[in-house]
């Protein structure tokens, strides 16, 4: 016996060790069965952690039998599995582990009573195979392999006899004539999966693949950007409902383009160069209710509209806060240079009405006297000024206010 074989005598392989088990605890446990001359736990070279197994060598080889007879063994709360280490030269030759049954030449180390039958006619069943092969001996089992998807024979199978002599007689005739077709017969070599032959249902280790729910790659429902419109200030709007001038996004692949910026509303200026008042006094939560021109007043502003954006026009084709010309007169000639006086009275533009949002109204100087405490302007047609006003004292030399006087 060589030195390698002598080194294996009296050695035990110990598997199932706990990660916390050390060489000292392993030696201490097996010392109760005899003198331990060597003890090692195999560790990972990178992490230096236990790999869960090790080796124990006794001085007396007979201690190995004592350990094996004292099963089960528990160390650090786990059941360990000690096995004797057999020298490599003394290990019996084993065939390579395989799966299922395989046709092939006869092997003395793996004899069986099963034969492989290939090329079986499509109209031949298990009954016909049993009737044919029973002339070689007692048939104990007939297995035909079927397609798992189509559920029809694949053209080969296995026959099991009661004794090995029947197998030898069937294999001596390499080709057999069954129902007018030449069939090949070989000895079947056993594999690990003896209870299940290849091709039977359930033999595949891969599950069926799930087909996608949509051929174009979209599964379930379209992207969320296709399902809602654009609302002001982040409001959610159901699909298909237009709000704020934006309709539902266009159909097609990909996400819809971003919405355009809000369109600015143009406020026209009346002839004469006098612009309309702009801005609102502080402390007001809503813009004043203007009533320019003819017709009913515009609807109240949308409280959900974005800040700084005027409400939509009350009538189609007219912009908010615009100053349309009176319907009774023709539109002014814009080719003429501006003059100091307007072409028509102020009242037709709505300046004589109450602008409650500003705290005071704009009056027509040709119809109402100024309210600044000065004397009335000759020809104005108004009553004399009162004794109190906004001026500094009762100075009769102060002329009345006129919006176009500089």
UniProtKB/Swiss-Prot annotation:
Comp. bias regions, Basic and acidic residues: 91-111
SMART domains associated with the record: RRM (SM00360)
Key word Cytoplasm present: yes
Top-level lineage group: Eukaryota
Tissues expressing the protein: Mainly expressed in testis. Expressed at much lower level in liver, heart and brain. Also expressed in ovary. Expressed throughout testes development, in both the prenatal and postnatal periods.
PTM statement from Swiss-Prot or TrEMBL: Acetylation at Lys-150 is predominantly observed in the nuclear fraction, and may regulate nucleocytoplasmic transport.
Biased composition (Polar residues): 195-207
Region of interest called Disordered, as start-end residue ranges on this chain: 74-117, 186-406
InterPro entries in the record: DAZAP1_RRM1, DAZAP1_RRM2, Nucleotide-bd_a/b_plait_sf, RBD_domain_sf, RRM_dom
Keywords: Acetylation, Cytoplasm, Developmental protein, Differentiation, Methylation, Nucleus, Repeat, RNA-binding, Spermatogenesis
UniProt-recorded Gene Ontology molecular function terms: poly(G) binding; poly(U) RNA binding; RNA binding; RNA stem-loop binding
Domain RRM: 10-97, 113-190
Stretches with biased composition (Low complexity): 280-294, 363-378
Sequence positions bearing Omega-N-methylarginine: 253
Pro residues bias locations: 247-262, 295-315
Compositional bias of kind Gly residues: 379-392
N-acetylmethionine found at: 1
Locations listed in the record: Cytoplasm; Nucleus
Job of this protein: RNA-binding protein, which may be required during spermatogenesis.
Subunit text: Interacts with DAZ and DAZL.
Protein name, as recorded: DAZ-associated protein 1
Organism encoding this protein: Mus musculus (Mouse)
Gene: Dazap1
């Amino acid at each position: 016996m060589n030195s390698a074989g002598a080194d294996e005598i009296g050695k035990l392989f110990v598997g199932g060790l706990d990660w916390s088990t050390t060489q000292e605890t392993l030696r201490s446990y097996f010392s109760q069965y005899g003198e331990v001359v060597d003890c090692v736990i195999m560790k990972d070279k990178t992490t230096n952690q236990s790999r869960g197994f090790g080796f124990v060598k006794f001085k007396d080889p007979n201690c190995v039998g004592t350990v094996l007879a004292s099963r089960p063994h528990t160390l650090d709360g786990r059941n360990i599995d000690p096995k004797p280490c057999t020298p490599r030269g003394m290990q019996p030759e084993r065939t390579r582990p395989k799966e299922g049954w395989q046709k092939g030449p006869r092997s003395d180390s793996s004899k069986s009573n099963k034969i492989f039958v290939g090329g079986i006619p499509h109209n031949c069943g298990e009954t016909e195979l049993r009737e044919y092969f029973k002339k070689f001996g007692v048939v104990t089992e007939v297995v035909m392999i079927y397609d798992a998807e189509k559920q029809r024979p694949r053209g080969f199978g296995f026959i099991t006899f009661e004794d090995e002599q029947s197998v030898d007689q069937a294999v001596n005739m390499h080709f057999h004539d069954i129902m007018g077709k030449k069939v090949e017969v070989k000895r079947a070599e056993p594999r690990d999966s003896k209870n299940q032959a290849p091709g039977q249902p359930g033999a595949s280790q891969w599950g069926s693949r799930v087909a996608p729910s949509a051929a174009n790659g979209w599964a379930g429902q379209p992207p969320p950007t296709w399902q809602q419109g654009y609302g002001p200030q982040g409001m959610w709007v159901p699909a298909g409902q237009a709000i704020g001038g934006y309709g539902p996004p266009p159909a097609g692949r990909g996400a819809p383009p971003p919405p355009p910026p809000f369109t600015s509303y143009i406020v026209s200026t009346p002839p004469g160069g006098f612009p309309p008042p702009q801005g609102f006094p502080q402390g007001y939560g809503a813009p004043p209710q203007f009533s320019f021109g003819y017709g009913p007043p515009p609807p109240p502003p949308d409280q959900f509209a974005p800040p700084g954006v005027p409400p939509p026009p009350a009538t189609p084709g007219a912009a908010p806060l615009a100053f349309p010309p009176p319907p009774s007169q023709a539109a002014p000639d814009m080719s003429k240079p501006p003059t100091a006086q307007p072409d028509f009275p102020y009242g037709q533009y709505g300046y004589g009405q109450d602008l409650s949002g500003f705290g005071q109204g704009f009056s027509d100087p040709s119809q109402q006297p100024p309210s600044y405490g000065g004397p009335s302007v000759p020809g104005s047609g108004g009553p004399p000024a009162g004794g109190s006003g906004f001026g500094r004292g009762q100075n009769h030399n102060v002329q009345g206010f006129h919006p176009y006087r500089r």
